Amino acid sequence: MSVINVPEVEVEMRPASPNARTLRATVVQASTVFYDTPATVDKAERLIAEGAAYGSQLLVFPEGFIGGYPRGSNFGAVVGNRSFKGREEFRKYYASAIDVPGPEVERIAAAAAKYKVHVIMGVIERAGFTLYCTALFFDSQGRFLGKHRKMMPTALERVIWGFGDGSTLPVYDTTIGRLGALICWENRMPLLRTALYAKDFGEIVRAKFDFDVVGHYARPDVLKLTVNDHPLNPVTFSSGTAALEKKDSENV
């Protein structure tokens, strides 16, 4: 697995079975070009090309990459009122979302086909007057396989995004294996994970740095970290047989 824009972090995933082939996946860590969807899609195409140059077969983009994750924005919303400035900001955000299917979807599909990679793309989907946080799936032949809409937006996300209804929990058979996705906090929801397990979702891949200690908006369970700075005696480990032999020799 490689991480674009962090060149020092590159780990190749190897299956447990010696007979299985190696899959190289790329996690894209990049920002949206806010309120400029064409520029964001241009950037996505460049990143897909860069991932393919690494030899990747699968590229996974961030939540809401096309359309943007508006971290820190409140869109002027308080209980009982919305400011004019906030309304204008939401108008721009709504205009930056994409229709699914639509021209932006076609461009990502074309890039997947051109570089022969599978892509999972985070987008803000516009459906009528509702926005959804959505993951789109593409295979290496450039086919748009389908989508997953985030079921339960977190906290203030519920002001700007609609709720998925459970009808978009796909797992797709592809040439590199079965692909599915959950978005952000959904990975902490046991029933959603169980729904994927029930569809024979072969393997769950989560980054080893998933534990976030810097205050991610969706980690209320992390209240504080306490560090014991007092020196402690070192702990050594040995086999049970060696420990017994040492004890017997001391008793002789």
Put a short name on every predicted segment.
Residues 1-252:
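Enzyme catalytic cores with a strong preference for nitrogen-chemistry domains
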